[in-house]
Amino acid sequence: MNLSDRERRDLVSQWAFDTRPILGRMHLWLENVEVEWLRGKQTPEFTKNISFMDGRMERLMTMTAAVTALGTQLFGRFGEGKDKTKDELNRVKKDADAISAYAMSESLWYATRQLPENHAVLVCMGEGLMPKVGETKEMGSNPQLGFGRVYARPQVAKWLDGRVTRLLNQKNYGWAEFREDIKNEGITVWGSAIDTLENTSRFAKGKPTGPLTVMHLFNQPLHITKPYEAYMGNLFLPIKVVRKAEEKSVLLDFMTPRKKVIEAIEETYPGIKRKNIHVWTLGGKSREKRLGWLWKQWNDLGVHLVEDGWVLPSGGKAFIDSGTYAPTYLVGTWIDGNKQTQLFLLDGYAASAEAMQAASLTPALDLDGTLVTFTSKFELPIEKERFVMRLKPGQPDFKQKLEELFQKTVDQDTVKKYTRMIMEAREAEMPLHHRVIRAHDFFPEKNWDVAAFSGYMCDDPYTGARGVECIDDQIYRVTTRISTPRAGKRVTFTLRLMEKPKEQRLIFNPLLIRFIYGEDFRTRPVKISDSGRIRNELQTLCSEALEYQSNGKILIRFDRIPPEVISLKDQKILREVLEWYKKHHPIWFHWLDMPS
């Protein structure tokens, strides 16, 4: 849409006004805004919102995605892990995760101060508990925004924090009690699933495509009661294919033999050539044990398994080493230059947060998405892994059924490990009792809604979105996307840094990291907001070391912080910082507890 100079100035002015809490916090100046409608009926900006949120909250959340992408790209050590040792690469990845998580957390903190007084955002699923590719369990979880993080006005946040603590600590306080308390208090809770940096390895290695930030907001909390992360099998198809199969009483989902899927595709798109059916799955030799059975099914059917470097409709090149979320936007058909129908679909597995995010896109993209919960280890091939979470550890034949899947005798340690993984999913109240999971199974109420926000650090070949572009040393263009069942828009911001690079870097770095790197915390003026800021940073940087006490305090156990996450030297500085704040500002930091 072409805008006159006056219309453009008005557009920028309103966006700047609505998003000023985030722009001010991050010391950014909004130079320009470009809005491109991708789906839905185009209406003049500011006349109609496209989600369950009001227009201002849509703009604040869109800016949150933009600021996270910009800050991570500029200050997250992009490309510094290239050709480095495994340990050095993982250090870069964790630093990148820390910047992205901090930028999004700070933006959400300021954005949600504009919520109605009885509203809150609750993070229900995050990405970072499991080791990333190339990491081991000993390296600890990654900086993240995970389950239980609350963003709201202070009184609402304090009240909701207390209920989340009860969910974590009290066995007799579950989802039913949590939901009843929310209703009785008259509070509206928006759930969220967040991955602050998708494709972290590609980011650390300096790959030109892939890295993005993803935040999904829902009009209700997800039915999940504990921090949980594992793998999930997933299959995404155009809804037309599933509807066509239903006409012949054929059920299409992740558990369906792929031969039946192909038959339904050919019924839906008469004359489509199998070589023009493109199936995207994660690839690589390391995944052959997990996915070999699935790859064989597709290869035997004569379809095209997407390979690394395959040219996409956008002109960009596919990658299959990571990144299961972005390809969801491409699922569907198009007509090529030879007037032949091409179909792209998504199969395989993903981490649970990414899988849930992709599944919740289905009403916005006219897709059908089905999931199956796997374990966090995924040691069995996919054809067996998909049955593990249905086993019942309390049954006498549990060990026997496990051995049938492994096709060998398993020791008691293996039995205990699988018992623990299954029980973790049950305790988090993951929906395990269905043949497959669809997005609506995560929600307590049927009328659920979603607003999906993406911010692109680098070019995205699946949607054609551009990554962060440098105009000059102070001005950058940042592309974002908002997708809802009503419409979809691409919003590109031109943002100017208001500080010199050294000062701007400090703004995007967690306060605790600045202290660890040498900033003098003793001479820095202390504000009451530092209490909440440091609390949030601890939850982001070392969540596994925190214990939430029934009296509202948080106990930090330094022995649970892996040195790969925070070195022993830096842990010593961190303890010194926290002890100083606790001693000199005991009222503001009454929530902080540390063993002697």
Annotate each predicted stretch with a short phrase.
Residues P208-R274, W280-A425, E429:
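Conserved mixed alpha/beta catalytic, RNA-binding, or beta-rich assembly cores of soluble enzyme
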Residues N2-E106, N118-H119, P208-I262:
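Conserved phosphate-binding loops in N-terminal lobes of ATP-dependent enzymes
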Residues Q342-Y548, G552, E564, R575, ...:
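Gly/Ser/Thr/Ala-enriched C-terminal appendages of enzymes
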Residues V250-L251, L555-E564:
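RNase H-like, two-metal
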Residues S51-H119, S249-I262, R274-W280, R290-G309, ...:
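Alpha/propeptide regions of enzymes that mature by internal proteolysis
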Residues A101-Q220, V311-I320, Y325-A326:
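Flexible, acidic active-site loops/lids enriched in D/E/S/T/G that coordinate Mg2+ and/or position polar
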Residues E7-L11, D18-R25, Q42-E45, N49, ...:
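General structural feature for long, well-ordered alpha-helical segments within catalytic domains
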Residues L115-E117, E185-G186, Y269-K275, I335-Q340, ...:
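Flexible, charged surface loops at secondary-structure boundaries
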